[in-house]
Amino acid sequence: MIENLVREEIKGFKNYEVHSIPYRYKMDANETPFELPEEVIKNIQEIVKSSQVNVYPDPTAEKLKEELARYCGVVPTNIFVGNGSDEIIHLIMLAFINKGDVVAYPHPSFAMYSVYSKIAGAVEIPVRLREDYNYDVDSFIKVIEKYQPKLVFLCNPNNPTGSVIEREDIIKIIQKSNGIVVVDEAYFEFYGNTIVDVINEFENLIVLRTLSKAFGLAGLRVGYAVANENILKYLNLVKSPYNINSLSQVIALKVLRTGVLKERVNFILKERERLIKELSKIPGIKVYPSKTNFILVKFKDADYVYQGLLERGILVRDFSKVEGLEGALRITVSSCEANDYLINGLKELLL
């Protein structure tokens, strides 16, 4: 009986899967190897007390918005805070997408664009990246001209390929589009280039950011959107009243104010280049350039490598069964110890 009540879009639907696998080093989800900054840990009791968990959190996350606005060089009314950027993607769909509307996104890219498009009943147009995983801007523009998508996603840098789309090409796509263009800058801190400065020039632009990656707060689920006030008012109409819990708001605020970001990002960038250099010495594999905190690597036998790493306690992300990513594993840049262990593990398996 229940099956007859389920929406057609949900029947046969496969959600995003997160596997629980024992590991020694977790290098599969692009998380930071760093714990909370020491000054935050020292004051954790005071932080918990100040968050007043016995009352509902600030529904507008006003103090956090003010700090994020300072960080982005905008005003607080240009900021929308979500329970991870995943929630914001979902809210964009709720606010703007009717069943049958067209959503375009790069492929391969972040899986949640497709997941939430399916839930919304949208018509999906995946736009293939080039063979080298760079954006095919001409193909994107042709899709926009032909299908007039109501929503276009650009992941920059792109996950899981680590490739980027240039600023002038993003602007070209925004100008061509009559719909909303979402530029997902989840890995901005590792790249340095942004489109945030033109949010008030283009009414149809939303920039997504997160505190899960460079700031190391994946467990708190804090993402945010930067856009003009007119577009954000519709996200506020469809969001839950208390979507960011009190602890997340207070800890995120403290971490934003610590000033540890630059040092930690520099460490990841240095380790990323070291990993790329060392892995490139191993014959039979292809290491792709990256502007993120992960690298994409192709192997002749990805299953063998994945299982071999797993047996050594190293968990990486297997994309080898995804169309366009055949033979590929994605590896998070982690601590020196974890990176060394990975390099040695791959040498044992392949040399």
Curated annotation (Swiss-Prot):
<keyword id="KW-0028">Amino-acid biosynthesis</keyword>
<comment type="subunit">
    <text>Homodimer.</text>
</comment>
<keyword id="KW-0032">Aminotransferase</keyword>
<comment type="similarity">
    <text>Belongs to the class-II pyridoxal-phosphate-dependent aminotransferase family. Histidinol-phosphate aminotransferase subfamily.</text>
</comment>
<comment type="pathway">
    <text>Amino-acid biosynthesis; L-histidine biosynthesis; L-histidine from 5-phospho-alpha-D-ribose 1-diphosphate: step 7/9.</text>
</comment>
<dbReference type="InterPro" id="IPR015422">
    <property type="entry name" value="PyrdxlP-dep_Trfase_small"/>
</dbReference>
<protein>
    <recommendedName>
        <fullName>Histidinol-phosphate aminotransferase</fullName>
        <ecNumber>2.6.1.9</ecNumber>
    </recommendedName>
</protein>
<dbReference type="InterPro" id="IPR001917">
    <property type="entry name" value="Aminotrans_II_pyridoxalP_BS"/>
</dbReference>
<dbReference type="InterPro" id="IPR015421">
    <property type="entry name" value="PyrdxlP-dep_Trfase_major"/>
</dbReference>
<dbReference type="InterPro" id="IPR005861">
    <property type="entry name" value="HisP_aminotrans"/>
</dbReference>
<keyword id="KW-0808">Transferase</keyword>
<dbReference type="GO" id="GO:0004400">
    <property type="term" value="F:histidinol-phosphate transaminase activity"/>
</dbReference>
<keyword id="KW-0663">Pyridoxal phosphate</keyword>
<dbReference type="GO" id="GO:0030170">
    <property type="term" value="F:pyridoxal phosphate binding"/>
</dbReference>
<keyword id="KW-0368">Histidine biosynthesis</keyword>
<dbReference type="GO" id="GO:0000105">
    <property type="term" value="P:L-histidine biosynthetic process"/>
</dbReference>
<dbReference type="InterPro" id="IPR004839">
    <property type="entry name" value="Aminotransferase_I/II_large"/>
</dbReference>
<dbReference type="Pfam" id="PF00155">
    <property type="entry name" value="Aminotran_1_2"/>
</dbReference>
<dbReference type="InterPro" id="IPR015424">
    <property type="entry name" value="PyrdxlP-dep_Trfase"/>
</dbReference>
<feature type="modified residue" description="N6-(pyridoxal phosphate)lysine">
    <location>
        <position position="213"/>
    </location>
</feature>
